[in-house]
């Protein structure tokens, strides 16, 4: 018979409600993670960047690195897909309902500078320590002062072996002394980051120039 008992119907309804609430919670978690856009690994064109090991990226999307509190650094010139890949991993983490937060490096530095002025350094470190996965995008576009660099180091040191951090940068580690205004602080930051870290170097062409030849002479 197609008839089901009242208790079975109620159970199915309850399961459906749980699924709905779980799905809604996942979507909310993605929304509050502050991603500038939502792109997954399936949206990434690995054919355009063939030097990237796709299986290595897929492994990062499995979030195994978070189990060991390891970090990820995407390093390469502007436009090669560093931010896209970082967001892909972040969306996977947020979908798994792991506390995730995305922030641009310059925005974070501005917040740290404000915290220093208001003598709230410990508060801001605790705030960004709480996320299971913190994604810091675009290190290296603007140099920062030594005092701000030191608070950033304290944040990285606080997260070391406790939480996972993903960073994207257009500068090799050898130039981080210039970025952070101090070679000693830069070395200390790098030391904490790379001890347990997957470093992905991307040297391909910019996606933003895909299909365009900016060196063509435009004679009007």
Residue ranges: model-predicted function:
Residues 79:
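Walker A (P-loop) phosphate-binding loop of P-loop NTPases
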Residues 82:
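Conserved lysine of the Walker
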Residues 61-69:
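Phosphate-binding P-loop
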Residues 1-37:
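Interdomain "pre-motor" coupling segment immediately N-terminal to P-loop NTPase/helicase cores
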Residues 85, 89:
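Hydrophobic positions on the alpha1 helix immediately C-terminal to the Walker A/P-loop
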């Amino acid at each position: 018979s197609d008839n089901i008992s009242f208790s079975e119907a109620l159970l199915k309804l309850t399961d459906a409600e749980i699924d709905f609430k779980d799905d809604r919670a996942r979507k909310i978690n993605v929304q509050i993670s502050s991603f500038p856009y939502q792109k997954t690994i399936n949206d990434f064109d690995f054919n355009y960047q063939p030097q990237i090991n796709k299986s290595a990226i897929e492994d990062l999307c499995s979030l195994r690195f978070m189990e060991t509190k390891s970090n990820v650094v995407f390093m390469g010139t502007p436009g090669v897909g560093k931010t896209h890949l970082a967001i892909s991993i972040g969306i996977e983490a947020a979908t798994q309902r792991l506390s995730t937060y995305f922030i641009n490096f310059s925005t974070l530095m501005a917040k740290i500078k404000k915290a220093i002025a208001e003598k709230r350094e410990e508060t801001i470190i605790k705030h960004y320590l709480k996320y299971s996965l913190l994604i810091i995008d675009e290190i290296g576009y603007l140099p920062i002062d030594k005092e701000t660099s030191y608070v950033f180091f304290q944040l990285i040191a606080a997260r070391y072996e406790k939480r996972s951090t993903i960073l994207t940068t257009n500068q090799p580690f050898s130039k981080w002394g210039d970025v952070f205004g101090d070679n000693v602080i830069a070395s200390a930051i790098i030391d904490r980051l790379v001890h347990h870290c997957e470093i992905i170097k991307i040297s391909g062409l910019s996606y933003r120039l895909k299909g365009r030849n900016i060196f063509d002479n435009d004679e009007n």
